[in-house]
Amino acid sequence: MTMAPRRRIRSRLAPRALLAAVAASLAFAAGAQQDARLPDLGSSANALISPEEAKEYGAAMLHQMRALDMVVDDPLTDDYINDLGFRLAAKSDRPKAHFAFFVVKDGEINAFAAPGGYIAVNSGLIIITRSESELAGVIAHEIGHITQNHLERAFEESKKDAPLMALVLLGAIVAGASGAGGDAPIAVLTGGQGLLAQKSINFTRHDEIEADRVGIQTLAKAGFDPNAMAAFFEHLEDVTSADAGGIQTPSLLQDHPVTTERISDAKARAGALVSAQKLRTVTSLDKDQWEKITAPMRFVQDPSALIAKPVGADSLSDYALIRERVRVLADNAPKEVLYYASSLKSEPGFDTPATRYGYALALTRSGRGAQAIEQLQPLQKLQGDNLILNLAMADARLQAGQRGAALALYSALNAGSPRNHGVALAYANALVAQGDKAQATQAADLLRPMLDNADEPEIYSAYGRASEKAGDSVRAQEAFADASYYSGRPFDAMEQLKRMLKRSDLDYYARARIQARINELTPLVMELHKRRISTDDNPDGEQQPDG
């Protein structure tokens, strides 16, 4: 269920395989093995570096994954996963620590934490969960590794070897993406694996259990079902059992078992919390109770194993809708149209409001806006004020050529949810598409307030296009440079900014603003150049920033 990278990959190793190596290099083994083998939640390592350095490493990883189209860069999805993550982080032992959450386009059931509090959740994991509490349990576990300083303890002896190893492996990704010599990525990767063999670092069994314990407490404090973590472990045991005709354990995770003791301990701790706090609980569903609404993944042996229902959430909850949204955005839209159409026709119980929304989204992305409108109209009657549904309707109307109705709906949504990135981005793009200078100015005005706290390249690209059509070429070029930086092309961003300084039409304030941005990016870009980590087509470092 993965989309091809935007840039052609000429290396023998695909970026996703190399990214898997990065995740594997940073993953922590789960201690003694017993009879229950489940995918480990894939915690990653941090080194003994400053918090700011850690954030830079984590941000560089995210930017490079974006450059290779490995991230679900969608404002609604970003808002949801970050709202969920920060709701948990706020109730953790370190509520003021830096965290950032994002979704990876990968059908593997996995999640990992990277330096600087960056936590990634694979699309495959989101799809396989049955409730928001189960998804929250995965994230809470990763937060637990960070808040309990497992990252620092695990690397106390190896100092900075592991994060540098991660950067070396990211360099292999870059080599594969940029078309550098065919054997270059393999050489980098082989060398990295050798270093890892010498500096093998794992989470201890105690660390894993402690992350579970802290995660369960965080779940309860944040108002989620503390039983969800153990329930998810058991669910994975069911669906990853080859003997049961389920999903094969992903190769990346085969060596990361979850012990029976760990499952039992999670159950016991959750039970104690429920008794003490009288929290709501949600019981796991047996297989014959599940609805077949999970998209097929590449490691499925029997499609009947992929059956799940949003337990404890109504069928039009944000969780249920975003899960379908992730399924569609992480895959090929025409393929998803066929999946939904076939399942709606042949699978009893598949037809739910959330799956109808997913079908409509896939139709719109496939250029069938009129059909998408037909799917969405009954849903709007169920929840007429649902922002996710209404935004989907606006997108469908725009695609179907109903521009007036689409713009009116975008405007109403923006008035009701000002500064919502998903609404503003869609509305701005629709305005710019009109080609009118006044509407382009309106689009730029919509997006400008979001630039102060946004790192989504789509926001900057859209603002750049709007500013360009509005006649403000300086702001447009600044925005395009920032879009390049956040897309994993830092050298390109620096070159754009330097070229801007040569313009004769810059006023004092514009020149000062551009120079300040160059000064801000220079140390970051120099560090990436030093490590040869960049997705720019710059294998020889010819665009080294002025020092």
Show where each model-derived region lies.
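Acidic/histidine metal-binding catalytic segments
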Residues: 77, 97, 155-166, 184-187, ...
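Extracytoplasmic and endomembrane cell-envelope/extracellular-matrix remodeling and assembly machinery
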Residues: 33, 41-48, 59, 71, ...
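Catalytic Zn2+-binding segment of zinc metalloproteases
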Residues: 133, 143-160, 178
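Membrane-active amphipathic alpha-helices enriched in small hydrophobic residues
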Residues: 163-178, 187-196
